[in-house]
Amino acid sequence: MRKCNLSSEEQAHYNADLLAYQNKAMRTLGLAYKFIPEDSGNDCAELVNEGNMIFLGIVAISDPIRPDVPEAVQKCQSAGIGVKIVTGDTPGTATEIARQIGLWKPENTDRNRITGVEFAALSDEEALDRVLDLKVMSRARPMDKQRLVQLLQQKGAVVAVTGDGTNDAPALNHAQVGLSMGTGTSVAKEASDITLLDDSFHSIATAVMWGRSLYKNIQRFIVFQLTINVVALASVLLGAFFGTELPLTVTQMLWVNLIMDTFAAMALASIPPSADVMNEKPRKTDDFIITKTMRKNILGVGFCFLAILMTLIVIIKQRPADLVGQALTQFFTIFVMLQFWNLFNASVFGTNHSVFKDSRHALGMLSVAIIILVGQILIVEFGGKVFRTEPMNFMTWVYIIAGTSFVLWIGEIYRWIKRIQKKD
């Protein structure tokens, strides 16, 4: 407007209109014209700089927030992920967009926003002091974005950057995770690690949920697998001290560790993602995958199983020689069934949910459970010398399956108590 024939009062009036539009998250364009001689050799930039233009008015363009963005931002914040807006828009427009998506709160102050020029003027020490508090950076230039990424990384943050333009390439390249838009430039796509085909921020929240759920499923399998291995190893080792023959044969361990565990891995890996993981805080990059809670579960459950199995070994040792084969078959079946029921507990490890809460989850686990149970029955009834088993009668099967199911019910009671305590 400074290039137009406007009085100071008119400029103030239009500037107020501009600010009002920007505070509504609208982008603005000013329109003006001038008459030029036909023989003028000046280019457009020179003609504009000469001034004396006739002002036509302002056009305000609204770019509405996608309906799913506020929810996605809220999910990310609940998950401990800090969201920051870095844009070339004006401070008013950027702040209003942040307010609309739920990022800017009434209690936020100027410490939580900055312009690119102000950010560049800060020393590294001053910028490091403010970088975690920043929510909005307006009028940002490419190097401002890159510097912000580097400062956040110095603070120990894992940084993901979204961008669609060529000027976003430096920040996309320096971030641990660069996310370009499907409609973005080829330069942005080449500098990024992932391209969002739907250009949706919601896809980022969904990807985080899937990633965390997959990580938790891996932890669940580790809990299940290590419990089996600890109990099996200790049973064989202590069984030798008790003076009994090998409690579990090589072929029996082959069934447990290769076949049964393969089906268990399939079941645990196929557990659908849960939105509950988005209420957890991020783990540190150097955290060991086996947590303190996992160690307690493995050792606690393993010790209980081992106590049961050692008691059985003592009983087997007192059996007449002609009944030892049947007793060892029962020992093997009890060992498998303890792990069988523990598989259900492992599937909800890290939550307070009931095994039966999610019908999809319960159906998938039930399918794998049936396969394992049928396999165990076939091995016992027809394994013979290969698996060192003898057929058992129907009631023995009922007693073993029902008796070992206490593992599941104790887990259900424990999780029920935890849910009650959480409500209180």
Where are these regions (language model features)?
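Hydrophobic alpha-helical membrane segments
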Residues: 337, 342, 364-379
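Membrane-embedded transport module
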Residues: 101, 105-161, 175, 182-351
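Cytosolic catalytic headpieces and adjacent flexible linkers of membrane translocases
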Residues: 1-151, 155, 169, 183, ...
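Hydrophobic alpha-helical transmembrane segments in multi-pass integral membrane proteins
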Residues: 308-312, 370-385
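Basic, alpha-helical nucleic-acid-binding regions used in initiation and control of genome expression
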Residues: 172
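Alpha-helical transmembrane segments
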Residues: 339-343, 407-415
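C-terminal membrane-solvent junction of multi-pass transporters and transport-like membrane proteins
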Residues: 290, 294, 351-371
